[in-house]
């Protein structure tokens, strides 16, 4: 019988995410908030919601709810783009900086604990296998 690799990977992602959510709870944030904030930090300043959604790999309507929550928490601002009134630009607030640092510390510590007992060579091998799987999946997806 073949290994249920897809199920195993899905379960791994689910419990990893649950652990991150649990550890970010004292900051009143979730893994989804972290991914969004992380991508805002990685992109050039004042990216549009469309560009951010593409970077994260989700549809724009899915992103709006998360951005609403981050705006309510005072971590981002959104303003209308001057050349396209339909587009919104996203900017981190000053109060986001210390929160992002705390979140990054939680993520870093959690990642180190999860990878405890796995050496760098094994991590590199796993990353290569994941890249191969992703490449194969994307090729299959693009064929259909």
Swiss-Prot record:
Subunit text: Homodimer.
Protein name, as recorded: Transcriptional regulator SlyA
GO molecular function, one term: DNA-binding transcription factor activity
Covalent S-S links between cysteines: none
SUPFAM superfamilies: Winged helix' DNA-binding domain (SSF46785)
NCBIfam families tied to this protein: PRK03573.1
HAMAP family, per database record: HTH_type_SlyA (MF_01819)
A Pfam family matched in the record: MarR
The keyword DNA-binding belongs to this UniProt entry's keyword annotation: yes
One example of a Gene Ontology biological process annotation: response to stress
Superkingdom assignment: Bacteria
InterPro entries listed in its UniProt record: HTH_MarR-typ, MarR/SlyA-like, Tscrpt_reg_MarR-type_CS, Tscrpt_reg_SlyA, WH-like_DNA-bd_sf, WH_DNA-bd_sf
HTH marR-type domain ranges (all copies): 2-135
DNA-binding region, residue range(s): 49-72
Purpose: Transcription regulator that can specifically activate or repress expression of target genes.
Similarity-based family: Belongs to the SlyA family.
